Amino acid sequence: VETLIYDLLVTEAWKDNIFPRVKNSLAKGFSLKSYMLMYHEATVINLLEILMFHREAIEECQDSVIELIDYCYRKFIWLMNLGDAKPKDHTGKELLDQSREDEIKRQHVEIQFSIAIICISIIRFISDNLSNLNIPVVHQMMEVNDIPCILIPLLEEKPWIRTNSKGEKEVYEDQKWQLKKDAQQVP
């Protein structure tokens, strides 16, 4: 678990510091290569989500969990700043007409959105086990990052709900946007 958290942080640092410098050259080349570079972070966070479901995994790596809480906090800030720029549905023609630079930008936003939503689950799993965690972990979550306070605007904004181009409500579930015809089904 600690190795995955370390890999996640290294990937985030690469994405934040190196990717902006190489994205234009990546756009000129093979698009699958650039997508896989961006998707690595999503793969690692997915593995961590599965592991964090289990109390033993959280308890085993309490020192690294502090770094994971900081990571999730940064993703929550990104999600709050997203506003109306959340991933939109595109027609096939729109996707074909995109330049490589626009395609990379769209993929980047979609992947980052998915990662941020997964971070909500991870924080929930950590929160469920607060009584079993040491004081520095609880302090990081409740005092330093003030996770409960940052979740309130996210719950009010509901970035996991969008209206598609047809005016229908969609909810982000299971790593994809799903149409919800019944208003009762929308959280």
Regions found by a protein language model. Give the residues of each.
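Long, leucine/valine-rich, helix-dominated scaffolding and oligomerization segments
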Residues: 1-186
